[in-house]
Amino acid sequence: MTTIDDYLQGIIKQILESYRHLLDLKDKPGDLEIIKTEILRINGFFKVIIKKIESSQIQSDIYIKLLKQTKHFLSNYEFEREIETMSTLYSDDPNRLKNIRLKIIESLQNNELMETIETIYNLKS
């Protein structure tokens, strides 16, 4: 049987994979679809983390911190509309691709969110 820690660890691993994928992109034509897919995955995983932590009433300080940070991210950052606008006008423009990708990465690093995720991942690995 999978424990909540193991379950969350699996989700965190997938968030890190998506994040690293965003870091590794070279801002070339076609990357906008990848960016869109990865941010949708990350947002979905954040929603799962929130639901799981709240429903299990985990009291661990690191998970409480992660809960607050993921809620903050979801309530303060929304890239889907901007990506949709870009897809019709500028999907092949490397400078615009780089700009949206870096804005997403910066937002994930804001409030030490990715640092907390990496800390949890390293604690459990």
Where are these regions (language model features)?
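Amphipathic alpha-helical binding modules
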Residues: 72-125
